[in-house]
Design a protein with these regions (language model features):
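A short amphipathic helical element positioned immediately N-terminal to and/or at the very start
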Residues: 4-18, 272-280
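Short cytosolic juxtamembrane segments of multi-pass membrane proteins
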Residues: 2-6, 180-195, 583-584, 674-684
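Small-residue-rich transmembrane alpha-helices
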Residues: 31-45, 78-82, 89, 114-144, ...
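Alpha-helical transmembrane segments, especially those used as permease/efflux helices
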Residues: 21-29, 34-38, 162-167, 195-308, ...
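Juxtamembrane interface at the cytosolic side of transmembrane helices
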Residues: 78, 86, 178, 224, ...
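Basic-flanked hydrophobic alpha-helices used for secretion and membrane insertion
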Residues: 315-568
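Hydrophobic alpha-helical transmembrane segments of multi-pass inner-membrane transport and secretion
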Residues: 20-47, 56-92, 112-122, 126, ...
């Protein structure tokens, strides 16, 4: 019986005596369990399930649980590998005293069991306690009524327990792999065996610089938001690879350059720190690169999701400039004539009146649309030979009658034969002429007219809104030409948008129970669709606002949760980096003090090393963020939010707050490093 408990006691004693190493690891494990449980529970929360807009939030949170699971696996592997390296000397001593590797494996097994039990139990307990607080915060972000019913998600408990059991099993197997094949002498000398100083690797440094320059060029050169979405992940991968190459290889090259600068290198505060950094920069560079990438992820997430959440009402108003939007679709060879549109207008207004409301701020207009690939100022409609890469260049072309545009905007614009006005959305159009499929050419009189808000802003593809005179004549010519050339029949649409004095819960189908104008209009238009053979749709700002809030609120909440996880991960990496360097530099500083280096000189050397290395990730993360700004702005346009000033503000505030937190971590970890390197000298 005592033999069975021996390994458990040895495991617990080893963890307790190495608590400086294990405590951050245990806290990280518990924090991952906590975050996973909360996100998993919220994604299936009955509160979100029964609220308007909750479906969008649930989907976003499910994606967040996948991110947490993958990140937990990678991060916990990284930190546990560090723990095993630091304890190799201890395991070597066990081996010398008669324990075989099988016995050491049993100690590791018990450490894994203890770690899993402590962290999973603590994480789930805190998760159940804090879950309701997170749910209340989520509900408040979605701006819906609060409920105070306490719930425990059994499925989330089981999922978290199973996931982290699998992760800890893999970590155990990796730890056994690290010890396999290492002799007792090798384990005992593991901390004393040094690495060869890495040489400056100019090829890898140049490769990193080229990759980073390429990613930055993509960020600033892409104009269309859809193309930005397509290339965003490629640019992210390029930045990650470049960051690792520059920190691992470029930092070594930098250290070699500093060593060649005798005035800088041969100073007490620089000599030890620079030589130490160059000696182990390959390992430290990877850690610093990880911190830089995590910092960039936090800054991008917080700045973009905060901008989305703060500007969500602007996005709603851009997509739905009026309370209601009625659209009737018909083929262009059978367009609605004036008598039919007047009948529809009277029918809509009568439906609103019978429901107890009135229309105001009315905008009614016709439009016809085609799509094709731009070739300079020519939009080619026959895209049979188009490649998959051309999909991001497909442009929507909407033609509106001049008289309808004037009526909708209150302007008095005029056009002659062959002249048009153009408004470009999510693309640039710098040309003086517009040609449609090489046959219909128009002179562009103005490229910057205000576009009509509403359905046009819903397209994520590049869009050109073209105001044209003699609309009916042009539509007939276009229809005849395209039907003969491609066999196409175009779709003509009549829009009738208006505000109403009805309360929001009576405007749209928000809760599925309250009688509302949206359902009444759909009932009226169903008869029109059946009798006339046309398509119809009704959109309510009030009903769709909940979906916007659900999506933007969910993204903001997920951004906060993931940022917390990534910040703690960055802190843990920095902490372990300082511990590792502190233990490795301890004997070196002891020797330097014995040959005349004072504690003041030691402190200066530490500050020099920390200031030179510690702030590099923050500075480079700031540079990454600046070049990512055009990408972020274009991606937000896909969410109907085009507010550059707001994005600049949220980005600046996010970086300032993060920099303050980073400075605090610098102070704390710097003190830890100093205490370690000064331990031997103070004992004397």
């Amino acid at each position: 019986m005592r033999e069975k408990t021996l390994y458990a006691r040895l495991a617990w004693t080893g963890m307790r005596k190495n608590r400086r190493l294990y405590l951050p690891y245990l806290l990280s494990c518990a924090g991952m369990v906590l975050m996973f449980y909360i996100l998993m529970g919220l994604s299936g929360s009955p509160v979100l399930e029964h609220m308007s807009g909750g479906g969008s939030s649930a989907i976003i949170l499910r994606l967040g649980t996948v991110v947490i699971a993958v990140f937990a696996l990678i991060f916990l592997f990284y930190t546990h590998s560090f723990l095993i390296r630091r304890r190799e000397r201890e395991f070597g001593l066990y081996n010398v005293l008669g324990m075989g590797k099988g016995n050491i494996a049993r100690i590791l097994l018990w450490e894994t069991v203890i770690t899993y039990g402590l962290t999973t139990g603590t994480g789930l307990l805190l998760g159940m306690v804090l879950y309701k607080l997170a749910e209340l915060g989520m509900v408040r972000l979605l701006q819906v009524p609060v409920t105070y019913t306490l719930t425990v998600s059994v499925s989330s408990l089981l999922a978290a327990a199973a996931l982290f059991a699998a992760i800890h099993t893999l970590i155990l197997l990796n730890g056994l792999r690290q010890l396999h094949g290492v002799s007792a002498v090798g384990l005992l000398r593991s901390e004393s065996v040094g690495e060869k100083p890495p040489k400056a690797q100019w090829v890898l440094t140049a490769a990193g610089a080229v990759l980073l320059a390429g990613a930055y060029w993509l960020a600033v050169s892409i104009r269309e938001p859809l193309a930005a979405l397509t290339w965003f992940f490629a640019a992210v991968l390029m930045v990650i690879a470049a960051t690792y190459l520059l920190f691992i290889s470029g930092s070594v090259t930098l250290c070699r350059g500093l060593q060649r600068n005798k005035k800088y290198y041969y100073r007490p505060q620089h000599f030890v720190s620079v030589s130490s950094m160059a000696y182990r920069m390959k390992r430290n560079g990877a850690g610093l690169a990880s911190v830089c990438i995590l910092a960039t992820m936090v800054l991008v997430m917080i700045s973009s999701t905060t901008c989305l959440y703060v500007g969500q009402e602007d996005a709603v108003n851009s997509r739905y400039p009026r309370d209601m939007d009625v659209a009737v679709y018909g083929r262009s060879d059978h367009p609605l004539d004036e008598a039919e549109t007047e009948q529809l207008r009277q029918g809509v207004e009568s439906t609103v009146f019978n429901f107890g409301g009135q229309t105001s701020n009315v905008a009614t207009y016709r439009e016809i649309s085609v799509s094709g690939l731009p070739d300079g100022g020519d939009l080619r409609l026959g895209n049979a030979g188009a490649s998959a890469a051309d999909s991001t260049r497909v442009t929507q072309l909407h033609f509106l009658p001049l008289e309808d545009y004037n009526a909708a905007t209150g302007q008095s614009l005029t056009l002659g034969d062959g002249q048009v006005y153009v408004a470009a959305l999510r693309t640039d159009f710098p040309y003086d002429t517009l040609t449609v499929d090489g046959e219909w050419t128009f002179r562009v009189m103005d490229r910057d007219i205000p576009p009509l808000s509403g359905p046009f802003t819903a397209d994520i593809t590049p869009t050109l809104m073209v105001v044209i005179p003699h609309f009916t004549q042009f539509v007939q010519e276009l229809e005849d030409g395209l039907s003969e050339k491609y066999g196409w029949y175009l779709t003509a649409t009549w829009h009738y948008a208006f505000d109403t004095d009805l309360p929001e819960n009576q405007q749209g189908n928000i809760d599925g129970t309250t009688p509302n104008l949206e359902d009444a209009l759909n009932g009226y238009l169903a008869g029109v669709s059946s009798d006339w053979g046309v398509g119809v749709s009704v959109e309510s700002k009030a009903a769709n606002r909940a979906d916007f809030y659900g999506t933007y609120g969910g993204l903001f909440f997920l951004g906060i949760m993931l940022s917390i996880v990534f910040i703690f991960a960055a802190v843990a990496i920095l902490y372990y980096k300082q511990l590792s360097e502190g233990y490795e530099d301890q004997s070196r500083f002891d020797i330097m003090q014995k040959v005349g280096m004072t504690k003041v000189d030691i402190r200066r050397s530490i500050n020099s090393q920390l200031l030179t290395v510690f702030y590099l990730p923050l500075v480079l993360a700031g540079v990454h963020l600046c070049f990512a700004f055009p990408f972020i702005h274009k991606l937000l346009i896909l969410f109907n939010l085009d507010n550059r000033g707001l994005l600049i503000g949220t980005t600046a505030v996010s970086f300032a707050v993060f920099a303050v937190l980073y400075a605090i971590v610098y102070k704390l970890t710097g003190n830890t490093y100093y205490r370690i390197v000064a331990e031997d000298t103070e004992k004397e």
